[in-house]
A protein has these predicted regions:
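Short glycine-rich anion-binding loops that position phosphate/pyrophosphate groups of nucleotides
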Residues: 1-4, 56-57, 81, 126-130, ...
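N-terminal small-domain helix-loop-helix segment of the aminotransferase-like
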Residues: 1-57, 62
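A general structural signal for well-ordered alpha-helical segments in protein cores
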Residues: 8-12, 30-34, 60, 84, ...
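Short, well-ordered alpha-helices that flank and scaffold nucleotide-derived cofactor binding pockets
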Residues: 13, 17, 39, 65, ...
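Conserved beta-strand segments of alpha/beta enzyme cores
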Residues: 44, 49, 94-96, 176-178
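PLP-dependent aminotransferase-like
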Residues: 66-124, 138
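Active-site pre-lysine segment of PLP-dependent enzymes
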Residues: 89, 97, 106-117, 130-153, ...
Length: 187
């Protein structure tokens, strides 16, 4: 699922332009790129609404470390991206794994019905990896709206450029919504 064609000519040109600075440590907080991504998505230029990590797995690990405590439940469907289970288990949480629907989509109704007082997080891969199926955007909006606000909803959009509508605009309405995107799959 990585780019088999190599970097674009523009990327090579940009790297060549900066090669004289490779001896300098990069900004560990990625301030400039966080600011630019934030502004691109309708936030102020503080960068406070953007986190940069090494792939979706890095973000999921951070979310697990910050939010998941022993006994907390995290709901997701399988088959899907394996890092959800890993982030839960590493932090002593309990994965609540549900099957996909017959048409291989995340079963939002079953996920909602699985919510308990121990539910801390819900993870939705949209489009799903490995099936490529997409959850209807209106159904996803309704789901996000009705989930209790103390539950973190993670929508993993690593493959969003291949189908579906991004949930990024919904971040402005729902403080419990985290949207993950990546540079390695698209953009």
């Amino acid at each position: 699922n990585e780019n088999q064609f190599g970097p674009s000519p523009k990327a090579i040109e940009a790297m060549a332009k900066e090669v004289g600075r490779v001896h300098i440590y990069p900004d560990p907080f990625c301030i400039e790129i966080r600011k630019k991504i934030g502004v691109m998505n309708g936030f102020d230029d503080s960068g406070d609404n953007v986190v940069i990590a090494v792939g979706a797995s890095g973000i999921l690990s951070l979310l697990g470390e910050v939010f998941i405590k022993k006994g907390d439940e995290v709901i997701f469907c399988e088959p899907t991206f394996g890092a959800y289970a890993g982030a839960v288990i590493r932090n002593d949480g309990t994965p609540v794994v549900l099957p996909l629907t017959e048409d291989l989509k995340f079963d939002l109704k079953a996920m909602y019905n699985a919510i308990t007082d121990k539910t801390k997080m819900i993870c939705i891969c949209n489009p799903n990896n490995p099936t490529g199926t997409v959850v209807d955007s209106e159904e996803l909006k309704e789901f996000i709206h009705k989930v209790p606000k103390d539950i973190i909803i993670v929508v993993d959009e690593a493959y969003i450029d291949f189908g579906g509508q991004s949930c990024v605009p919904l971040i402005h309405q729902y403080e419990n919504l985290v949207v993950i995107q990546t540079f390695s799959k698209s953009r």
